[in-house]
């Protein structure tokens, strides 16, 4: 890995390109692996309510490791942290390929993802600064969503052909991400921090307190947590919605529908990069409310074309909503608790929201509530939550 103390802050520097490529391949593997593993669960006749449990063990790793991964990201060169994390993902995907319990293998991928996230976002503030940070976030989100688009579809299509081929493709993507990480320049870290677990937990709780007590960062944390909690729940809702509403039982169709959301988020992220700055973040809030309005309308559809269009609209609104909130947290968090710790706190909030929403969704499926009413109620509650957040933000 090349040694560098001073960074080229160009939006298209060599280091930024390496980060974007690594992010694409890593996110491609994450999304392909989800649908490949869901296909494996179906092939092995696991109950439907166990599907969200797969994601819950993944986000559980984020929550348990939250006090530690931020310091890891800040104490070592972030490119090396990303490389190690992608290596863990590779190991997890390979273990599922070789017949180890899919929940255990997916948990290992979750450990890698937990270590990866603070580094991948924290490095943006080191590779670029100021007005370019929102644009860099737009590039990162566009890369991630392009990977969601292609990875989700690849996972479903390959799983319809052969589940083992789909799992092997995921491992290959993670291997490519490890190689791309080699080309990220070695940036300055903050070594010398205590590695006592009690002290690290206390430090993390202090970072949580600092960010949650600040009005701007609390606003960002709540908004992104609600968005990603809702987003991951929607992915699983689609898996059950497709056969009920459309009468289609393959693995590929839910991935095509998820791809529509991904395309929309790319468009929305690009629009946010052009139209929203750190000083005008509140412009994104109406888009968040509209997500909750569109989801119930989507849930009532019975034809593919309207479903595609509405999911793309949900994606556009989502991209426009979440990118400015991410940038706000990174900018304010970098100055107060360090970029890595800020993202770790964000991950705790987002994954706690995911765990809660997935748990409620899994329980609803387990007790037999039909998927269409689940979708309607889910959208309505999301719209109310974002409306309440906007009202709170305007008053404070």
Curated annotation (Swiss-Prot):
Ranges per topology, Periplasmic: 1-17, 74-90, 166, 247-255, 301-303, 364-365
Top-level taxonomic group: Bacteria
InterPro entries registered for this protein in UniProt: LysoPLipid__transptr_LplT, MFS, MFS_trans_sf
Localization per record: Cell inner membrane
UniProt main location, coarse: membrane
Gene Ontology terms: cellular component: plasma membrane
Name of protein: Lysophospholipid transporter LplT
Organism, scientific name: Shigella flexneri
Record lineage: Bacteria, Pseudomonadati, Pseudomonadota, Gammaproteobacteria, Enterobacterales
């Amino acid at each position: 890995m090349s040694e560098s103390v001073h960074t080229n802050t160009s939006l298209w520097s060599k280091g930024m390109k390496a980060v974007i490529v690594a992010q694409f391949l890593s996110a491609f593997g994450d999304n392909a692996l989800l649908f490949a593993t869901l296909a494996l669960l179906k092939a092995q006749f696991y109950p439907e309510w166990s599907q969200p449990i797969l994601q819950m063990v993944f986000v559980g790793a984020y929550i348990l490791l939250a006090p530690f991964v931020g310091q890891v990201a800040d104490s070592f060169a972030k490119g090396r942290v990303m490389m190690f994390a992608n290596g863990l993902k590779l190991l997890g995907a390979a273990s599922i390929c070789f017949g180890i319990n899919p929940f255990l293998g997916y948990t290992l991928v979750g450990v890698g993802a937990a270590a990866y996230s603070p580094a991948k976002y924290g490095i943006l503030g080191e590779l670029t600064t100021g007005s370019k940070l929102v644009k860099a976030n737009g590039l990162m989100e566009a890369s991630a969503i392009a990977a969601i688009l292609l990875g989700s579809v690849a996972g479903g299509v390959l799983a319809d052909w052969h589940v083992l081929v789909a799992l092997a493709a995921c491992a290959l993507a993670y291997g490519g991400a490890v190689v791309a990480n080699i080309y990220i320049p070695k940036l300055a870290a903050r070594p010398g921090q205590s590695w006592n677990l009690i002290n690290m937990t206390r430090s993390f709780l202090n970072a949580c307190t600092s960010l949650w007590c600040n009005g701007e960062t609390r606003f960002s944390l709540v908004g992104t947590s609600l968005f990603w909690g809702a987003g991951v729940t929607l992915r699983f809702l689609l898996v059950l919605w497709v056969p009920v509403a459309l009468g289609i039982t393959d693995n590929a169709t839910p991935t095509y529908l998820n791809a529509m959301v991904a395309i929309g988020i790319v468009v929305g992220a690009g629009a946010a990069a052009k139209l929203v700055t750190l000083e005008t973040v509140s412009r994104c809030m109406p888009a968040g409310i509209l997500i909750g309005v569109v989801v119930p309308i989507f849930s009532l559809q019975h034809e593919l074309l309207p479903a595609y269009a509405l999911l793309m609209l949900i994606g556009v609104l989502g991209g426009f909503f979440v990118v400015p909130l991410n940038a706000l947290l990174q900018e304010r968090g970098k100055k107060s608790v360090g970029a890595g710790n800020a993202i770790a706190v964000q991950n705790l909030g987002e994954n706690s929201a995911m765990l809660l929403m997935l748990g409620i969704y899994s329980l609803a499926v387990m007790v037999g509530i039909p998927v269409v009413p689940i979708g309607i109620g889910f959208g309505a509650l999301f719209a109310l939550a974002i409306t309440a957040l906007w009202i709170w933000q305007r008053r404070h």
